[in-house]
């Protein structure tokens, strides 16, 4: 970016600065080590053992797509990810801890390896690059309550302000998901723009809180 004199925005999940590995990244780590068939089988065992009343509701179909999202992925992988996204956060976190313990994966070490820290963020800021918010906990904003996403967005913005001495003005939706009630919160917190995961060029009449972007 510096060589071609291009402006870039780095969206920070602020909980990683506290050493936390977000759920989505735990899923990516698991899928990079193990087959999706093995993980789905383990998920079904987990539900049967800990949440038998939810086992049928969250059973993962490997033949029919749950949504039209993730068409670039095979059905099993897409449905595994989509199911975990809508799973209640406490149950999702418990399942992922269960997997990491079973497979002897060190979340703290992985977090240090894959994410930049405060020093690197400062360098990016010093070099004139934009520091945006990707929330604090990287929750899918259409799957949690307004009180939860309001607190999460405010915490992320406050953390970045404290770190960079500047309030973030650009926001990126985790998983590209939102509900309409998120937009007023972004305005209240001081964000000027927000980007989705829609990959296309910008139009003059695009909503400033629904800007497509390439990453």
Language-model segments: which ranges?
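Short beta-alpha junction loops
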Residues: 12-18
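A short alpha-helix capping/helix-coil boundary motif
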Residues: 98-101, 136-137, 160-163
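Histidine/lysine/aspartate-rich catalytic loop segments that bind and position anionic ligands
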Residues: 116-148
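Residues that form or immediately flank small-molecule/cofactor binding pockets and catalytic motifs
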Residues: 15, 136, 199
């Amino acid at each position: 970016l510096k060589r071609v004199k291009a402006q870039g925005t780095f969206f920070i999940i602020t909980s990683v600065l506290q050493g936390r590995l977000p759920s989505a990244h735990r899923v990516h780590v698991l899928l990079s080590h193990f087959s999706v068939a093995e993980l789905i089988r383990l998920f079904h065992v987990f539900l049967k053992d800990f949440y038998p009343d939810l086992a049928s509701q969250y059973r993962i179909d490997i033949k029919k797509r749950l949504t039209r999202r993730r068409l670039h992925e095979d059905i099993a992988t897409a449905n595994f990810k989509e199911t975990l996204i809508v799973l209640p956060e406490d149950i999702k976190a418990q399942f992922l801890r269960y997997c990491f313990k079973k497979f002897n994966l060190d979340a703290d070490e992985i977090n240090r390896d894959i994410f930049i820290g405060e020093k690197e963020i400062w360098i990016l800021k010093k070099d004139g690059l934009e520091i945006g918010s990707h929330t604090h906990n990287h929750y899918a904003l259409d799957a949690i309550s307004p009180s939860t996403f309001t607190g999460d967005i405010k915490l992320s913005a406050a953390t970045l302000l404290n770190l960079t001495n500047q309030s973030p003005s650009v926001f990126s939706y985790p998983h590209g998901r939102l509900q309409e009630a998120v937009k007023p919160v972004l305005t209240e917190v001081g964000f000027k723009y927000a980007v989705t995961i829609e990959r296309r060029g910008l139009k003059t009449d695009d909503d400033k809180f629904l800007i497509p972007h390439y990453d």
